[in-house]
Amino acid sequence: MPLRHWGMARGSKPVGDGAQPMAAMGGLKVLLHWAGPGGGEPWVTFSESSLTAEEVCIHIAHKVGITPPCFNLFALFDAQAQVWLPPNHILEIPRDASLMLYFRIRFYFRNWHGMNPREPAVYRCGPPGTEASSDQTAQGMQLLDPASFEYLFEQGKHEFVNDVASLWELSTEEEIHHFKNESLGMAFLHLCHLALRHGIPLEEVAKKTSFKDCIPRSFRRHIRQHSALTRLRLRNVFRRFLRDFQPGRLSQQMVMVKYLATLERLAPRFGTERVPVCHLRLLAQAEGEPCYIRDSGVAPTDPGPESAAGPPTHEVLVTGTGGIQWWPVEEEVNKEEGSSGSSGRNPQASLFGKKAKAHKAVGQPADRPREPLWAYFCDFRDITHVVLKEHCVSIHRQDNKCLELSLPSRAAALSFVSLVDGYFRLTADSSHYLCHEVAPPRLVMSIRDGIHGPLLEPFVQAKLRPEDGLYLIHWSTSHPYRLILTVAQRSQAPDGMQSLRLRKFPIEQQDGAFVLEGWGRSFPSVRELGAALQGCLLRAGDDCFSLRRCCLPQPGETSNLIIMRGARASPRTLNLSQLSFHRVDQKEITQLSHLGQGTRTNVYEGRLRVEGSGDPEEGKMDDEDPLVPGRDRGQELRVVLKVLDPSHHDIALAFYETASLMSQVSHTHLAFVHGVCVRGPENIMVTEYVEHGPLDVWLRRERGHVPMAWKMVVAQQLASALSYLENKNLVHGNVCGRNILLARLGLAEGTSPFIKLSDPGVGLGALSREERVERIPWLAPECLPGGANSLSTAMDKWGFGATLLEICFDGEAPLQSRSPSEKEHFYQRQHRLPEPSCPQLATLTSQCLTYEPTQRPSFRTILRDLTRLQPHNLADVLTVNPDSPASDPTVFHKRYLKKIRDLGEGHFGKVSLYCYDPTNDGTGEMVAVKALKADCGPQHRSGWKQEIDILRTLYHEHIIKYKGCCEDQGEKSLQLVMEYVPLGSLRDYLPRHSIGLAQLLLFAQQICEGMAYLHAQHYIHRDLAARNVLLDNDRLVKIGDFGLAKAVPEGHEYYRVREDGDSPVFWYAPECLKEYKFYYASDVWSFGVTLYELLTHCDSSQSPPTKFLELIGIAQGQMTVLRLTELLERGERLPRPDKCPCEVYHLMKNCWETEASFRPTFENLIPILKTVHEKYQGQAPSVFSVC
């Protein structure tokens, strides 16, 4: 919520119709917006000398009737310090002092009510196996319980009357008129709610409560400036409206929903936090930036304590539905803030003060400030961990990008981190916290003791269903201080079906101990209680329940505690059952020296020849000699050739599966796989060459000379790569020192090491038991017997723990001197591996190396805890000049772009795969680079810049991500750098893979979602086709190629094209061909053609050009366009694809309506395609209903 209003309105009413109390002489007083269904004083007092903020929130929530699943939406606000308190903040109050705080909803999600169809629906995750309700309002109501809903309404009223939307911020007469009308409507809803709540006529309420008490303060002051006659006329008009209004069936709840929905529209700042920061920097480890290291001195990237007193340089916006965004504050705004005495803490408050003064001086509203152009950083699900050092905050993203912030004070930094952490727990993982400094005490206890949050019964049932004897302990959904032990029992129904019956046993807290109902023993912790119950039988009447294994919370699991935003996404898991990798021709590789042996492979250094563009200087460094003669015909890359021994042809499939896995992932700390080459009987995996080779070899060579700080940076990078794989539910399976390749040494001052995790080699399932034993201690114990069930991300956590020991011990892994039988015996007896001398590091490794897979921490947890493992003498190792200018991560330099291969061509441009390697040492990331063809004219170059300007403003899951630009001033060229999507376009992918109808319909739905977003930004694509839809994985597509995209002018319905050039006419609607007009509906026509392509699996013999040319006959140039236009106007359309269901072809034909206004919008198409997708999901092709 915006913070500025508390400073302005400390004497105002925290509850709409209750007076604010004076502070007590001693103790803590927490003011409320709503005192609960029974009423009472709008505050709660505490006399305890020491409490945590979480304890206070839980006590108040219980008092007013808020249920445990909604606890995490609330927090305490300190109006005097203008900060929110993190949940672990300890409130120590002397008896002779007093403290006043506010209990408020802090975590807010716009459109939770579902009243705005233009915004994503928000709802709690539904039970497993169910789909979300189509009623968005019903979805939203699941977010809040009745008490939270009442509290939000009262808090919203308080925000509104205290100018969360101010009249003085508006500039045009139209805006001011709209604001006044909406405010009077809000006042009416306010009075209507009072009438319905008290059961009295609306006119009676209006006599007791003036409408001026229900409108913003700025509006009230504006009314006071009018004459008495004008004020009387306004009052009479409002009363007449109240008298004539017939409420009908308008319920109290609907009034409240309408009030809050209108408040969202009128006040975009409602439910958001805009945090001023004194310093902001974006970092990318790929550029050689050092990691953020915890130490006793100033952090390397810490701008220093003096910056905390300066004015804000940036603002960070945090919203529940929009994630984290930022923008630079203009110097003029900073000067105004400094002169207003706000000390940079609250720029909006000072800005408001200046406007008020200006208004009093001239009697007119001041010009509204320019709305900031927010730069998107990430969603909460993309965050791996957050580091807090004094007043400096570092937010780390899944792709290794980092946002560094310096806030005005330590309290402001804690407030900000607790905000990000709270949203993360609400949207990504309810059983994980991002930063130790703001960790909720109850969650810390729950993680330590294996306690689930307040789960609803369907989620409990789903967790206990897999096997008999499972049980779990979770917090009650109705009582904040009660735990529930739930156990399941299968029973045989008369019809032969098995049913799962749950039995719940309450666990009460008594004097700091935990007692299971019906059992006289007490335990100091839930963990000890659970350990005592392991293997026991619980009797309840005639029933007997066996407790065999406790079901522990797992990373990122879905439950009613997770809030979904937008359409329910399909799991982003890669399809590993289908092989997908680049085929390398044997003529493109040259085998050089032998490097050693791997598991059933021989490893060679090699050269991979990649096709060049004919430019002899392309890809050449300034100080680099040509690799080979004839560089103008291409270039050669240094690679590693892993040759599978021909005698092991029986495991070639497992070898291919490894190549396929590594070809479908892209991360800066994963070694790149170029593809597979079949050379006679040999199968060769062609992988990236990394300069300094295996880490374990290098560590042993440098024994005793590698500082611990260096090793911890390497450990963080390895954990980052494994966290990326875990997030995709992928298993590496062979994490060890020899598979970590050292790309940069990072021993020089101001540099850091850089590693890449290599491919795992031959899959674990193809190895013999002897080969698996050889991999001890890196192989997880559960994997030793073999079998598909043993493969899980938990095995990578064990491998990481063993590798961490290997790194700490300078490349010497434990148990290497033992015989195979001794290694097996070690695992069978569940012995512990040796631990490092550092206690914190020993704790982390022991957690990774526990024999129970479900108890191993997630890689998010590992990354978070690694930041606390740094020794106190690291400041001198990674010192960075804070005054050095920050590099712009969106600016790419040509000399660092190394071409790998061409990816495809469009009408005017060419897309290639490059490795961006600014340090020239193998640490680059794979990017897709688009450049104009050399023969393009000025018009095309102008359109090219427009394409870049469009793409850099877009951010959507189903639109290709913009990374930056590469500009060459000498050649006057501009290249667009985008994310690399490994699987390529649908046009190339579908003919080579067997994709079912349901999956094709999912792709179509995602295309509609991306196009709906594009249209909402007032752009038309003009080139939507299967060739321009890219496949990230087998469940996710992204729209690319915006070369023909145009911005629709404000107030217009179409864009008229005037330039000549090649156009994809067979995808164009009649109005485009005939009148050169492109409506939003013209993209819908193109979508219909794209859907046709999908249903034909992009068969070239069934392509739109082929089919249309069959209908119109032989023609050239404009005659083709003319005949095509006549054909379409006669009602001729593309035929129904083979095995295309009737309703899908009917949908295509709706998109092909001749009249643009008759075509559906993409917003209309999304729910239709979702329904059709759900219908055919899981059905065999034979049951599809075709015409």
UniProtKB/Swiss-Prot annotation:
Keywords: ATP-binding, Kinase, Nucleotide-binding, Phosphoprotein, Repeat, SH2 domain, Transferase, Tyrosine-protein kinase. ATP binds at L903, G904, E905, G906, H907, F908, G909, K910, V911, K930. The active site is at D1023. PROSITE patterns: FERM_3 (PS50057), PROTEIN_KINASE_ATP (PS00107), PROTEIN_KINASE_DOM (PS50011), PROTEIN_KINASE_TYR (PS00109). GO terms for cellular component: cytoplasm; cytoplasmic side of plasma membrane; cytoskeleton; cytosol; extracellular exosome; extrinsic component of cytoplasmic side of plasma membrane; extrinsic component of plasma membrane; interleukin-12 receptor complex. Its EC number is 2.7.10.2. CDD domains: PTK_Tyk2_rpt1, PTKc_Tyk2_rpt2. PANTHER family: NON-RECEPTOR TYROSINE-PROTEIN KINASE TYK2, TYROSINE-PROTEIN KINASE HOPSCOTCH. Interacts (via FERM domain) with JAKMIP1. Interacts with PIK3R1; this interaction is important for cell migration. Interacts with MPL/TPOR. (Microbial infection) Interacts with Epstein-Barr virus protein LMP1; this interaction inhibits TYK2-mediated interferon signaling. This is Non-receptor tyrosine-protein kinase TYK2. It comes from Homo sapiens (Human).
